[in-house]
Regions:
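Core residues of bacterial helix-turn-helix
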Residues: 24-25, 36, 43, 64
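Helix-turn-helix DNA-binding elements, focusing on the entry/boundary residues of the two helices
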Residues: 17-18, 36, 50
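N-terminal winged-helix
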Residues: 30, 77, 87-116
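Alpha-helical linker/hinge and terminal dimerization helices associated
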Residues: 42-43, 64-86
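Residues within the DNA-recognition helix of helix-turn-helix
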Residues: 28, 34-38, 108
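Short helix-boundary/capping micro-motifs
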Residues: 10-28
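A short LG(V/I)-centered, amphipathic sequence patch enriched
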Residues: 40-57
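The N-cap/first-turn positions of alpha helices
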Residues: 2-8, 29, 61, 68
């Protein structure tokens, strides 16, 4: 199961409609339906009962949705934190008093640059 499939599944559960979910996800209805069918084959049970006016989540689908929503929340948190992590990449913060630490700083900085070019 991919993150994309989880997002698709969650959105269809939210709207109880493959067409409305497809519209919100900016994918075609046939592509979304195919992805859901692939997911059902992979996990071995039906997620939805198809009806003339949309879909109804099965009992198994409701149980799976709890786990999927938990994973998606963590995934979204991770994605939001990536820019912050990238900003701190390879940054060394150093503080010293100019009158007493200058010589020590340059000696340590030289050693640091040998280890971390």
């Amino acid at each position: 199961m991919t993150i994309t499939q989880m997002q698709y599944f969650s959105m269809v559960c939210q709207f109880q409609s493959i067409s409305k979910a497809a519209e919100q996800l900016f994918v075609s209805q046939p592509a979304l339906s195919a992805s859901l069918l692939d997911l059902e084959k992979e996990i071995g049970f039906r997620l939805f009962e198809r009806r003339s006016r949309g879909v109804v989540t099965t009992e198994e689908g409701r149980l799976l949705l709890q786990h999927v929503d938990s994973v998606l929340k963590r995934y979204n948190l991770l994605m939001r934190s990536l820019p912050e992590l990238a900003e701190h990449q390879n940054i060394l913060h150093v503080g010293f008093r100019p009158t007493s630490g200058e010589n020590e700083f340059f000696s340590l900085f030289k050693k640091y640059r040998q280890v971390q070019p």
